[in-house]
Amino acid sequence: MEKRFLKLIEERPLVTREYTAQDGTKKVFHSKGYVFATGLDEFYAELTGDAARDAQPLDAEALYCMQGQIRQRSFTDKNGNRRFENTITILKLA
């Protein structure tokens, strides 16, 4: 697996949302988004949960390595076309 260093392009503010779990209890979901560049591409990725809540501001001058999980989902748009969406969740950031 090739390792690439990432440059921080944008750090989004922490977002906190309340929701009701399936068992009826109130829960809080935290997320914090980042835009990174590889030198060729730019992409958006999110930290979630306690990691997002506890995240310290990143140094815009530093380079980062990220371990993440990429998920895709397909959906049908309003015109009946099948579309795809990717979601990148940050697992580790160093």
Predicted feature locations:
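Single-stranded nucleic acid-binding surfaces, predominantly the OB-fold ssDNA-binding core
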Residues: M1-A94
